[in-house]
């Protein structure tokens, strides 16, 4: 019997192009096995129907994944107008039908109405938790759980293609936006129904789909080639300000102490900390009132010195 390759410590970020038909977790596990990585996590669930950008965080990168969850995102969505499905997408059953002879002008007006700061009720078929279980588990049993509306921002909706009943839109939005629900809202504004037939995440936190890699492409590379595709852990927090500390101050941070710091930095956001030779140490909080730095999330000493 062939022995499985031993798992190894891998640290970094893989920009994965998730294929259609796989859950985000299944895609994550396939990537983890390709890298023989000990630890892996992803940032932001994509439905099985959806494809596109799924950042995978290996090892120490997982410590900073939460900061990517808050990032803005962009999607390309394909709608079928005139039909509602039980799940809001093509995986569900058609449960209602209405007019599909929508004009481009009507569709443009509806898209404009759903742009900006809006409130959105998350769909039942989602990974949001209720009493420890994802909502989709209740939905599959026909149980409807009351959901509170969320404040979201839809920065733009651009119409890429329109030939009713088919419409393709490009959406830029804040975290927590459900494109299925947005598509239903666009249709409702017109007085009809809609569901998604395709969804692709094209951007998140400044990363683009052009930077991503498919599972098939990764499988055709050797270990060194795959490792060379990993981005460093600090790309997840590159939007925060940065500073450099000397070795003594870094040591204090790593020991749970608060080194003195007197530079002009914002105190209301995490700060990236680097050593004098450019090594990423982690995130700290600048406590301006006492001129001290407090550790928030730090790289493991062995990993950060590798």
Curated annotation (Swiss-Prot):
Catalytic activity: uridine(55) in tRNA = pseudouridine(55) in tRNA
EC number annotated for this UniProt entry: 5.4.99.25
Active site: 47
Top-level taxon of origin: Bacteria
Pfam families for this protein: TruB-C_2 (PF09157), TruB_C_2 (PF16198), TruB_N (PF01509)
Keyword match Amino-acid biosynthesis: no
Record's keyword terms, sorted: Isomerase, tRNA processing
Protein task: Responsible for synthesis of pseudouridine from uracil-55 in the psi GC loop of transfer RNAs.
Protein name as catalogued: tRNA pseudouridine synthase B
Species of the source: Neisseria gonorrhoeae (strain NCCP11945)
């Amino acid at each position: 019997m062939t022995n499985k390759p031993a798992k190894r410590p891998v640290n970094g970020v893989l920009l994965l192009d998730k294929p259609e038909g796989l859950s985000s977790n299944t895609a994550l596990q396939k990537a983890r096995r390709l890298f023989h990585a000990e630890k892996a996590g992803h940032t932001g669930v994509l439905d099985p129907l959806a494809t596109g950008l799924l950042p995978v965080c290996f090892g120490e990168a997982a410590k900073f994944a939460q900061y990517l969850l808050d990032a803005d995102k962009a999607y390309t969505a394909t709608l079928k107008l005139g039909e509602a499905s039980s799940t809001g997408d093509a995986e569900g059953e058609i449960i209602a039908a209405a007019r599909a002879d929508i004009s481009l002008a009507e569709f443009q007006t509806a898209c404009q109405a759903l742009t900006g700061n809006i409130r959105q009720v998350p769909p039942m078929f989602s990974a949001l938790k209720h009493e420890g279980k994802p909502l989709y588990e209740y939905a599959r049993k026909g149980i409807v759980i009351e959901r509170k509306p969320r404040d979201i921002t839809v920065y733009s909706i651009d119409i890429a293609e329109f030939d009713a009943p088919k419409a393709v839109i490009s959406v830029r939005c804040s975290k927590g936006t459900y494109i299925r629900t947005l598509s239903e809202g666009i249709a409702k504004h017109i007085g009809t129904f809609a569901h998604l037939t395709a969804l692709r995440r094209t951007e998140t936190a400044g990363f683009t789909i052009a930077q991503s890699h498919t599972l098939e492409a990764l499988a055709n590379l050797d270990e060194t080639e795959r490792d060379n595709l990993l981005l460093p852990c600090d790309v997840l927090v590159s939007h925060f300000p940065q500073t450099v500390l000397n070795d003594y101050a870094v040591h204090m941070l790593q020991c749970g102490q608060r080194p003195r710091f007197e530079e002009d930095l914002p105190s209301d956001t995490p700060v990236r900390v680097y050593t004098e030779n450019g090594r990423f140490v982690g995130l700290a909080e600048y406590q301006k009132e006492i001129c001290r730095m407090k550790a928030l999330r730090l790289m493991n000493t062995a990993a950060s010195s590798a």
